[in-house]
């Protein structure tokens, strides 16, 4: 599992560019070197299968290291991974995305394909996504705008704000508020256990169920 500030950006070329910047809290240079040796981030490149693997050796000293990772990939790339604690940004890519995180604030921008994002804690901002999108959050908010995708959202504790969505929407909330505006598609299905719902300018077949709330 990787943690830190992570930026993944697509580009028109065929090459891959990776920069890892580590800042260490230590009482001496010797201690800092020891911490870095035991917290290395290994990068594996399989040219035949066209796969790049980034894996951290140990998370023992995560509380003493602040990492910044910048990864530039070809536009047509698939991403699969697990992230511990981070600020994550993914943009300008086409492919399949399967991300699991523990505590992550994420920004997904200009992505196209099959997008599946799961986080235990943290907020998700999704902008200009297309394809098939599923966003699952245990505790946090989801903000979706200017997207053309078939979208499924699942939140246990948090709010959903959607503005300008073209495509089918299925939204499930255990506890929280749902605000939707400017949606157009075959179906808009909203399920809320406890919370409130406000919809404006909906051009979809609307099916809303609220157990407790309005």
Where are these regions (language model features)?
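Acidic (Asp/Glu) and glycine-rich low-complexity loops/linkers
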Residues: 3-119, 123-137, 143-154, 161-172, ...
């Amino acid at each position: 599992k990787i943690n830190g500030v992570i930026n993944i950006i697509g580009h028109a070329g065929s090459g891959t560019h990776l920069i890892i910047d580590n800042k260490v809290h230590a009482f001496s240079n010797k201690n800092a070197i020891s911490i870095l040796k035991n917290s290395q981030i290994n990068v594996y490149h399989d040219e035949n299968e066209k796969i790049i693997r980034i894996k951290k050796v140990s998370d023992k000293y995560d509380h003493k290291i602040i990492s910044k990772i910048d990864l530039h990939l070809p536009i047509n790339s698939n991403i699969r991974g697990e992230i511990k604690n981070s600020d994550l940004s993914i943009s300008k890519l086409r492919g399949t995305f399967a991300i699991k995180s523990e505590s992550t604030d994420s920004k997904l921008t200009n992505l196209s394909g099959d997008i599946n994002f799961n986080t235990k804690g943290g907020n998700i901002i999704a902008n200009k996504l297309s394809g098939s999108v599923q966003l699952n959050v245990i505790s946090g908010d989801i903000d979706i705008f200017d997207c053309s995708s078939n979208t499924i959202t699942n939140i246990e504790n948090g709010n959903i704000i959607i503005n300008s969505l073209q495509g089918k929407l299925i939204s499930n909330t255990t506890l929280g508020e749902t605000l939707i505006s400017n949606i157009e598609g075959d179906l808009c299905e909203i399920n809320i256990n406890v919370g409130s719902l406000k919809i404006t300018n909906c051009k979809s077949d609307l099916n809303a169920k609220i157990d407790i709330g309005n």
